[in-house]
Amino acid sequence: MKKYILALLICCFSLSAFTQNVNLSNSPYWDGECYLAVNPKNPMHMVSAWMYFSTSNLKNSMATRTSFDGGKTWSALQQLPHLYSTFTSADPTMYFGKDSCVYLAYIDLSGLKSSDSGYIMVTRSVNGGVTWKTPVKAISYKAQPNLPIDRPWIAADASNGPYSGRVYLTSQNAYFTPQPHYPWITYSSDSGATWSPIKRLDDSIPSGTITDATAFTTISANGTLYAAYVSYYTKYSLYPRLVIIKSSNGGNTFTPYIAITYGSSDAMPVADSLTKAGLCIASNPADTTNLVIVTTTNHFGEPDILTYNSHNAGKTWSGPVRVNDDQMGANDTIHDLSWGSFAPNGTYAVTWRDRRNTGKSDTVPFQIYAAISKDGGNTYSSNFLISDAISPAVTIVHGDDFLGCGLSDSAVYSLWSDMRTGKENTFFNATSISKIITAVPIITDNQSVKVDFYPNPFHDQTNIMIHTSLPMQNTTMQVYSMDGKKVDELPIGEGVMHTITINSLARGTYIWSLVQGEKTLARGKWVIE
């Protein structure tokens, strides 16, 4: 006899992701703002980095751990040294270069709001991130006025082109310094040992009055460098725009394109001051003409995860495409903190911070969700859950702005920080892509009702999330075999979240219907493995 256990979870609940979340930092202190780099030549090999509170000097340092088996096991934690014992570190960024050499850049400075001294440091590892070379100064706080050492991004040319092995580093002026602020770039042709003088990326289309002039970077498989920054320069446009800078000659000259012209509908609500709306640009290793940008804007009436894509090497862009598939305009449901990446075969994934199940505003708890695209960012899969616990809100206004996303051809890798332990710690998850692409879409017959199942397919347990403002009295979940026989009928009570555990049921596909009285509200399929 089949046995179902139906539990209503009201205030505090957890979900089962496809694989268990792994706490990489395991710290009783604050650990946040992480980055994940996956080796494109061996996607089972990845390196994680994050800001780690060090008890040796009571400052933040850079911490790294490495996995060579797809995240099943990790090396011991490594801490990068400071220039001086009084310094603190922030803003990790990594990139795999030629011969699987991995580069790590970060800020090391006298204080997070200090104008005293600081540098963007670069180190590299020739053994996959197990150990690191002595970090070198790439950009000095004195290289240009107003501290041009904020929010670095690093990228390395791993192609077989004429600039193979060149490493690029971008930065911006510190947000708290006087305007103007610019995106800056430098490069190294000797594996990061020495660096060229920094120069402005925005010499053709100025960043204007933008405070955060960050230049996000990627390099295509043919060695073309792309950088994306926001410009609000009213002499050229009355609207803010996202500028894409392209260089095919090693960063010597740049060609600008406009990817996004932002309108008033894109502006983030003033009340949502904790929303992290940074962006990411990624190039498709299987198609050098395909790039995808992911960001957060208010375009569809609330902060959503949106992507824009190019299929002609950055010349023109399509979008926005809404990635999160919860109900549109659902009362200030805020999704943010996104990152995207490609697998070697061209599959694209986005990971983000999601609040569809936890309430309104940017101060409510959150979960981590993801979605994949098999067509270069034109369309996306159903969203799937990454985190297996709900985290209390992170209330840091400045900083803690990014998480990590990487892929192999068979798995999505996610790295993020949350507060489930009471202190912000850094977590990792690997989710099999086969579990995602075989999931069956849900048909909604009543537009005021949305039903999600995670995971699906599943083995012995799945989670039902019912999003609706309708009362759920006299509602049941009717389950049918594929030959049309009703095999069970489960009562559904009030509340968003329900968990079903199946002790005995044959593998196969089953049809379910959410029924209220004589009306079918939603229907779909379960795949039991």
Q: PLM features: residue spans?
A:
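C-terminal outer-membrane/trafficking sorting elements
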Residues: 4-6, 444-454, 458-529
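Bacterial Sec-dependent N-terminal signal peptides
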Residues: 1-20, 440
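Extracellular, repeat-based ectodomains that mediate carbohydrate processing or recognition
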Residues: 19-437
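Short, solvent-exposed secondary-structure boundary motifs
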Residues: 27, 439-446
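Small side chains
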Residues: 14, 217, 227-228, 340, ...
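Short glycine/proline-enriched turn or capping motifs at secondary-structure junctions
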Residues: 3, 419-427, 517-521
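Compositionally biased non-globular segments, especially hydrophobic aliphatic-rich helices
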Residues: 10, 86-88, 354, 465, ...
